[in-house]
Structure formats: C-alpha cells, structure tokens
Swiss-Prot record:
The gene is irak1bp1. Coiled coil: none annotated. It comes from Oncorhynchus mykiss (Rainbow trout). Keywords: Cytoplasm, Nucleus. It comes from the Eukaryota. The keyword Metal-binding does not apply. Its main location: cytoplasm. This is Interleukin-1 receptor-associated kinase 1-binding protein 1 homolog. GO terms for biological process: immune response; positive regulation of canonical NF-kappaB signal transduction.
Length: 240
C-alpha cells in the first residue's frame, strides 16, 4: 500500500477580544480586525489525507468446449452427454461446487447430419485448484476438446473490500498526521468533527503472471478531509 503525504491545516481560534493588525498597513493603524470568540467556538485541526491500495483479481473463469456430429439425434446427444459427464465428474473430484459451473448445449442439423456443441463454464476462486483441473482435462481429453486459458477478473465483493480499505487507510493516515500536528502545538487530539471523502479513483494496476497468463490488479486511491477538535493538555490531566 502506497500512502502519499497529508496536507494539514490547524485552526487555533483566539480568545474573545483578541485584536489582529495588518503589518503591511502604514503604522499598523490602517486595518484592524477584532475576533470575538463565542461560547461554542472550538480549536480545530483540519487534515487532508490520502492512500493507495492495490488488489489482484480474485476470480477466474475457464471454459471447456467441444462438439460432435452424428446421423441421429440420439447418437450425437449420447456422445456429448458422456463427455459432459466425464468433465463434471472430474470437477466434482476436485471439489468444484455445482453453483460454480454452468453447462450449455446447442444442437442443429446441417448436411443431413445432427451437430451438437457443448460448453462447460467454471468459475474458480482457488487458482491452485484451477491449475490442477486444467492439467487433468488436457491430459485425459482428446484434441477435439478445447480448454481455454483462464480469464481473471475482480468480484464485486473484492472491489467493495478494496474501496473500503483504501478509504479507511486514508482516514487513518489523516488521523496520524493530525495527532503529530496537535502534539507539536501542545494540544491533545480530540474527537473527529467531520469526515468527508473528497476523491476516489480506480485504475488498472498492471498484470501479474507469466507469458500467456495475466492476472490483472486494480489500484484504488482515496483522499479524505477530516476535522478534529483540539483540547488543552492541562484539561486532560486528572486533578489530584
């Protein structure tokens, strides 16, 4: 995770009746500002913090496709069904759940023959499991069966976690910076008064993997604006 520096602004409100003069005015008498502090006014520190978090793809799909042609519907259906059942059995042996796969079939007639095409689509979250399944299918099935290369992507759960994580990291970075600033000013950092995410972006974070296999990643950035109240250190000490 890469974190960029925060921009910090501290506002220490003056006490009632404090007078500020413009030093640029001749004799300092030309411009006078009087600030009246109300009962509800408070000392504050305002911080803009940012963070960046990257996350690789957490899902991949692999498709297994094949077709056959026969003179009768029963023959082509039985041929395709046997192959589909073998593939499903292999997937079950490797603990692939039923909700993680779909099977589609399509039959049509051309040139006095019946043609059937089948496609088995599998979603993997365990990439080691995916590799083992692909090796078995490539070894056991003939060349008429096509096993695709994995297509990696980010699930909605992964993207949601990424967005929350980068925002929390930006807020934490802002809090640490505000704590350092308040300590430097001789104050104690109080409760947050305002937290606002000002900017959130996502971009392609590059690809991981060897030649032919690319596992993409996404980089998310967040910039937040946070206001904390400041307390005098003396007020935090217990009276003896």
């Amino acid at each position: 995770m890469a974190i960029s520096p925060s921009r910090v602004f501290a506002a220490l409100l003056p006490t009632a009746g404090d007078i500020y003069r413009d030093e640029n005015e001749p004799g300092m008498g030309g411009h006078t500002v009087t600030v009246q502090r109300t009962q509800n006014s408070a000392r504050e520190v305002q911080v803009t913090g940012s963070a960046e978090v990257s996350c690789p793809a957490d899902r991949a799909t692999v498709s297994v496709s094949f077709k056959n042609s026969k003179e009768s519907v029963n023959d082509v259906t039985n041929s395709i069904s046997r192959r589909v059942e073998y593939i499903l059995q292999t997937l079950r042996q490797h603990h692939v759940k039923g909700e993680e796969l779909t099977v589609t079939r399509h039959i049509y007639r051309a040139d006095d023959l019946y043609h059937m095409e089948a496609l088995v689509m599998v979603v993997f979250s365990d990439f080691g499991q995916m590799e083992r399944v692909c090796i078995v299918l490539l070894e056991k099935l003939d060349k008429s069966v096509c096993v695709s290369t994995p297509h990696f992507y980010h699930s909605e759960e992964c993207l949601g976690l990424l967005r929350r994580s980068v925002c929390v990291a930006a807020v934490e970075n802002a809090r640490l910076k505000a704590s350092e600033m308040s300590s430097m000013l001789g104050q104690t950092l109080g409760h947050p008064l305002l937290v606002r995410e000002e900017e959130a972006t996502e971009r392609d974070g590059g690809r991981q993997g060897g030649e032919g296999v690319h596992r993409p990643s996404i980089s998310a950035t967040s910039r937040v604006f946070v206001t904390f109240n400041l307390r005098h250190k003396d007020r935090t000490r217990k009276k003896i």
